[in-house]
Each structure stands twice: as structure tokens, then as C-alpha cells.
Amino acid sequence: MNKFVKSLLVAGSVAALAACSSSNNDAAGNGAAQTFGGYSVADLQQRYNTVYFGFDKYDITGEYVQILDAHAAYLNATPAAKVLVEGNTDERGTPEYNIALGQRRADAVKGYLAGKGVDAGKLGTVSYGEEKPAVLGHDEAAYSKNRRAVLAY
């Protein structure tokens, strides 16, 4: 009888462990969160989705290359993914000038991504000029946060 109880306990333990095991099937299909250039999809879409620009500038500086490369890798690896690049400016300048500058910023990011092989059909652009400030204020601290392009998925 003692041997029977031990066998029953071992079988019960094995069954309990089997019930606690989990499948390796996640969104990436490999048991780990999928990353692109070291960034998770959530990080790319929510935390690292903004490129900032200097005053009256629309060139992409080196500090954004790694992030944009990660966005390009994500877009290239994800057939259904599309992004709208939103160009923005600070409040200085005429509304017409700022719309044009915001568009140049959006186009610069789009051009960078296209240069990394992203299909142009996955890339849209829009300029909001000064109409959608990230930070309200009339000083350089606010202006620097408003001169941006946002990748909106």
C-alpha cells in the first residue's frame, strides 16, 4: 500500500507540474517579446516615436538614427504595419511657413525610412505646423519640444 501511495503522489506531482507549464506561443511565436534594434514594439509605438529638430531645421541628426533604424526594421518585418509621420513646429513664424516646415520634417523622416527599404505605401505624412504643440509655453524649453516629427501607428 505504501508503494501505491508513493506512486500516486509522484503521478499527482507530475500532473500538477504539467498543468503549470506554459506554451511558448506568444505574438512573436518564439517565447520572447519581439524586438527591433533593441526596442519592443510597444516602446517604438509609444516611447521612442518622436524625432526632434533644431530651430528652422528638418535634417535628421545622428542621435535618431538607431531609433529610426528600429522603426524601419519593424515596418519591414510587419506586413500590416503602417505609420503616419506627423510634422510639427513651434509657434514662431507664419502659419503658412510652419505648415511647410512641418511637412519638410515629416518628409525627412519618411525619406529616411524609405531609404531603409520601407515600402512607400506604408508611409504617410501630414503637417500640423504649430497647431498641435506638445508643450505649451513661449520659451526655448517649450519650443524645443514642439519642433518634432511623431511616428503615429
UniProtKB/Swiss-Prot annotation:
Coiled coil: none annotated. Residues 55-56, 97-101 are annotated as: Peptidoglycan binding. CDD domains: OmpA_C-like. Pfam families: OmpA. Gene3D superfamilies: OmpA-like domain (3.30.1330.60). Its main location: membrane. It is a lipid-anchor. PROSITE patterns: OMPA_1, OMPA_2, PROKAR_LIPOPROTEIN. It is found in: Cell outer membrane. One of its GO terms (cellular component) is cell outer membrane. Keywords: Cell cycle, Cell division, Cell outer membrane, Lipoprotein, Membrane, Palmitate, Signal. A lipid is attached at C20 (S-diacylglycerol cysteine). A lipid is attached at C20 (N-palmitoyl cysteine). Residues 40-153 form the OmpA-like domain. InterPro entries: Bact_OuterMem_StrucFunc (IPR050330), OMP_bac (IPR006664), OmpA-like (IPR006665), OMPA-like_CS (IPR006690), OmpA-like_sf (IPR036737), Pal (IPR039001), Pal_lipo_C (IPR014169). Residues 1-19 form the signal peptide. One of its GO terms (biological process) is cell division. The Tol-Pal system is composed of five core proteins: the inner membrane proteins TolA, TolQ and TolR, the periplasmic protein TolB and the outer membrane protein Pal. They form a network linking the inner and outer membranes and the peptidoglycan layer. Part of the Tol-Pal system, which plays a role in outer membrane invagination during cell division and is important for maintaining outer membrane integrity. HAMAP family: Pal. Belongs to the Pal lipoprotein family. This is Peptidoglycan-associated lipoprotein. It comes from Haemophilus influenzae (strain ATCC 51907 / DSM 11121 / KW20 / Rd).
